[in-house]
Amino acid sequence: EERMSVWERARRRGRFLEQILEDKRAELARRRRVLDEGVLRLQARMWPVPIPLRAVFPDPPTSPRPVAALMRAAPFEGLLRPTYDPVGLALALAAGGIAALAVMTDARYYQGRLEHLAAVKQALLRRRLDLPVIRHDFFLDPFQVLEARAFGADAIWISLAMLSPTGLQALLEAASECGLSVLAEVRTEEEVERARAMGMQALIAQRRDWRTFTVDPALPARLRPALPESALVLLAGGIRSPQEVAEAAALGVHGVILEEPLLRASDPAAWLAGLGFRLEVFQRREAG
């Protein structure tokens, strides 16, 4: 398949991140030609006020809450769910005690779509479920932030490794204008300092290195002392066992993002229940 052949070429050259950014810039140029900014701004105003991420994470954290990352495929794992139903997954996981949903919208490597984001948010609203929906993508341009809001996002998930200082500033200004929370992925103390200097208060300690796609299980413990005490802190990167959830709890983080292992499970809600989260403390009722 052409998608995977491009990825394979990047893997062989050791240019994972560079290939992703190159492809995303080309995609952005195409999207700007077909999506009118004025129409997106009108769409953005049609959604309810965004749900702040802080609203669903107790502070200080008593136990980490689970966040589900929804995607059909991943470049380092291949196809995760041949029959991918993001709305069905979202509703099953919401009933299972999930705190928030991150919907991957990158098409080239994850087989995502902006329409998946909107469909998930609409389904939650119809059932009056107050779960934040996060747009996960490779953010490079404020236009993507406007897209996120226009398709129902409450928050965006960005990676500092992919952004220049001016690029980060532009994204933060756009998110503030749209009322969106920003989750910033960090892997180094330098990136933590960048986030701190920009006043960012929601961070993801990412165990996966975007340059190699390898996972470093020890990274959160190394990075935790550098993370601001006042920040909302989540962990991500191939978390798959009750032991890893217990380790996250010991670090005092607010949440854990569950990705490929969750999506490979035949019954994701049952798999979630077996991870040892204290879900009974956080079960949400439908508003009424």
Feature annotation, model-predicted:
Residues 70-81, 95-112, 194-224:
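Glycine/Thr-rich beta-alpha phosphate-binding loop at enzyme active sites
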Residues 7, 69-85, 131-140, 181-186, ...:
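Active-site mouth loops of central-metabolism enzymes
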Residues 99, 103-105, 147-167, 204-213, ...:
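Glycine-rich phosphate-binding active-site loops on the catalytic face of alpha/beta enzymes
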Residues 64-66, 120-136, 174-183, 226-236:
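Short beta-strand/loop segments at the ligand-binding rim of alpha/beta enzyme cores
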Residues 222-226, 249, 262-288:
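C-terminal helical cap(s) of enzyme catalytic domains, especially alpha/beta-barrels
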Residues 1, 66-70, 101-103, 133-136, ...:
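Hydrophobic faces of well-ordered beta-strands that scaffold small-molecule active sites
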Residues 1-83:
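An N-cap/entry alpha-helix motif that binds or orients negatively charged groups
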